[in-house]
């Protein structure tokens, strides 16, 4: 299995946490893992390594630039409430849509991530998998390739961290997308990729009723592919009932990685309180690892 890990970072966050994430992949992932770091007109020579490539996403994806230009002055498309003439409107009527601005509706902000992924999928012919990693992740010990092979089945188009509670039957919550594996050998992946880009090129993202983040559009489209094309997806989150929906470290990924989600960025670690009782054989030993024994109890 040949893997390309991709990530991106906001201006000013390279030294804060993104460099640490990239360093940890180079140190602890299989030695043939390639890394692509997407950026926005930032200095490209801040980091040199034979397995790392920097790509200016605005140069690589002109349709992203067009989308952001179309909607940059529309408060609603940027997560706020104030509507403007001929602007977009929230289609949702649920709890995420009511009464306040929210990142959940910031389509402009999260479009960057989508176009990073779609660029990588279109330009990785010699690879078997593209894996998206958020820049605030950290790989704390060596990860054998066998782990990744087992984690991402060849018959699944996507491997992701689901957060749906099957007992509620309420439409659920979209995935946690700090880690997503895209199977480049799957016969539908390029069609999926084109459809995902077209949600932004054709402004269809604004038709969604639960949110406009990258997680929202990924989940929306993957459900269509599962239903209409009988595509398999691999949910390694399995909804674990975790406070704050921090499924990342409660999945098998917690055996090797941490995700500094939200306030954890400042702390530089997740906390022991982020774990729930492990009942799966794959994850029962996570909290016995030295890294997690040293983690703060709470934040």
Listing of model-derived features with the role each one plays in the protein:
Residues 113, 133, 175-178, 214:
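Residues that flank catalytic or metal-binding motifs in active/ligand-binding sites
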Residues 140-206, 211:
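Conserved catalytic core of nucleotide-sugar-dependent glycosyltransferases
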Residues 95-105, 204:
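Short glycine/proline- and acidic residue-enriched helix-loop micro-motifs
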Residues 16-19, 111-115, 212-220:
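A structural signal for well-ordered alpha-helical segments within the folded catalytic domains
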Residues 179-299:
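Catalytic core and acceptor-binding pocket of nucleotide-sugar-dependent glycosyltransferases
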């Amino acid at each position: 299995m040949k893997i390309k890990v991709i990530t991106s970072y906001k201006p000013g966050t390279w030294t804060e946490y993104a460099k640490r994430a990239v360093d940890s992949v180079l140190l602890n992932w299989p030695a043939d893992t390639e890394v692509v770091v997407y950026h926005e007109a930032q200095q490209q020579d801040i980091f040199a390594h034979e397995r790392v490539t920097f790509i200016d996403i605005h140069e690589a994806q002109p349709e992203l630039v067009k989308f952001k230009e179309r909607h940059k002055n529309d408060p609603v498309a940027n997560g706020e409430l104030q509507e403007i003439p001929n602007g977009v409107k929230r289609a949702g009527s649920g709890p995420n849509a009511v009464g306040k601005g929210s990142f959940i509706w910031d389509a402009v902000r999260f479009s960057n991530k989508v176009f990073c992924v779609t660029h990588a999928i279109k330009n990785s012919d010699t690879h078997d998998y593209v894996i998206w990693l958020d820049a605030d992740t950290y790989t704390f010990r060596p990860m054998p390739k066998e782990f990744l092979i087992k984690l991402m089945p060849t018959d699944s188009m996507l491997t992701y961290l689901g957060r749906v509670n099957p007992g509620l039957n309420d439409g659920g919550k979209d995935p946690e997308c700090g880690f997503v594996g895209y199977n480049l050998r799957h016969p539908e992946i390029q069609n999926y990729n084109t459809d995902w880009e077209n949600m932004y090129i054709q402004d269809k993202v604004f038709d969604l009723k639960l949110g406009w983040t990258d997680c929202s559009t990924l989940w929306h489209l993957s459900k269509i592919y599962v239903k209409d094309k009988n595509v398999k997806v691999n949910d390694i989150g399995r909804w674990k009932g975790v406070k704050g929906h921090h499924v990342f470290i409660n999945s098998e990924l917690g055996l090797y990685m941490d995700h500094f989600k939200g306030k954890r960025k400042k702390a530089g670690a997740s906390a022991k309180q982020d774990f729930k009782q492990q009942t799966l054989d794959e994850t029962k030993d996570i909290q016995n690892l030295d890294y997690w024994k040293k983690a703060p109890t709470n934040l």
